[in-house]
Amino acid sequence: MKYLDVDGIGQVSRIGLGTWQFGSREWGYGDRYATGAARDIVKRARALGVTLFDTAEIYGLGKSERILGEALGDDRTEVVVASKVFPVAPFPAVIKNRERASARRLQLNRIPLYQIHQPNPVVPDSVIMPGMRDLLDSGDIGAAGVSNYSLARWRKADAALGRPVVSNQVHFSLAHPDALEDLVPFAELENRIVIAYSPLAQGLLGGKYGLENRPGGVRALNPLFGTENLRRIEPLLATLRAIAVDVDAKPAQVALAWLISLPGVVAIPGASSVEQLEFNVAAADIELSAQSRDALTDAARAFRPVSTGRFLTDMVREKVSRR
């Protein structure tokens, strides 16, 4: 495993574990998964050197935090547990109460990394961040982070906090590389981290899905799996497959290896089984050449997906044509 040293947090594994799926019926996991496989996955993650475990108060309405805290056991104080507060009425007293509730569910006195889940479109960070500052000053959290913030808003959060907001968790993958343009350079320059969620684009970068093999369930509603986007992404997938052959790995592992080869970037893929966790963690051992890394970066930047509106229009048209 590779690690980054982060101020206020300590060693953060470059491959972490996203736990949004713990107890999530929408993704087919459910209660049995939560009480069995989830615990096995967390224990195996610790054995493999994973130190970053991401959750949030809204994941399963607190269930993810409870399962994670229970599964970590005595290790819960030895790792970087990252949770998030959803910024509804994000005033200092509310944020403190919500953080304390998350800490109780996680069975922690102190949450190492506490993040604002998304920017509030109405309430500015000058109102939100004083609550985070109070939590830092009281020692209830180790560091403050944000999620889904633009660079401009990240800078405003910094100013409002009066100290560095150490992380920004964003949608980031070869299929969604926007963070390359500004967030990653900022993180490198300012010694921050970018936490990449959905790093495998819901399985698209694993090479399993294509025009002849469409996903079902909620994935089918992801615009990336639309007909035109599956055509447009093929050059990127071809590059990914070719490099995977060169390094004797799978495309999904190369996609993760590309992310964590970038300065200040860590990835938090989910896992539905111990085997999937082991597969993801193995990506940390892949060393990409500069040529391979650049080829993937170029292919990612060249991918131009169609808009959501176009995706929806195409989807309706295709369904009508099948009648």
UniProtKB/Swiss-Prot annotation:
Q: What class of enzyme is it?
A: oxidoreductase
Q: What is its EC number?
A: 1.-.-.-
Q: Which Pfam families match?
A: Aldo_ket_red
**Which InterPro entries did the record assign?**
AKR_Detox_Biosynth, NADP_OxRdtase_dom, NADP_OxRdtase_dom_sf
**Annotated binding of NADP(+), by residue:** S198, P199, L200, A201, Q202, G203, L204, L205, G206, G207, K208
Highest taxon, organism lineage = Bacteria
Q: Tell me which GO cellular component terms the UniProt record holds.
A: cytoplasm; peptidoglycan-based cell wall; plasma membrane
* Alphabetically ordered keywords of this record: NADP, Oxidoreductase
Read off the Gene3D superfamilies from this record.
NADP-dependent oxidoreductase domain
Which positions are catalytic residues? Y59
A single MF term (Gene Ontology): aldo-keto reductase (NADPH) activity
Q: Which family does it belong to?
A: Belongs to the aldo/keto reductase family. Aldo/keto reductase 2 subfamily.
Protein's name according to its UniProt entry: Uncharacterized oxidoreductase Rv2298
- Tell me what organism the protein belongs to: Mycobacterium tuberculosis (strain ATCC 25618 / H37Rv)
- Kindly list the organism's lineage: Bacteria, Bacillati, Actinomycetota, Actinomycetes, Mycobacteriales
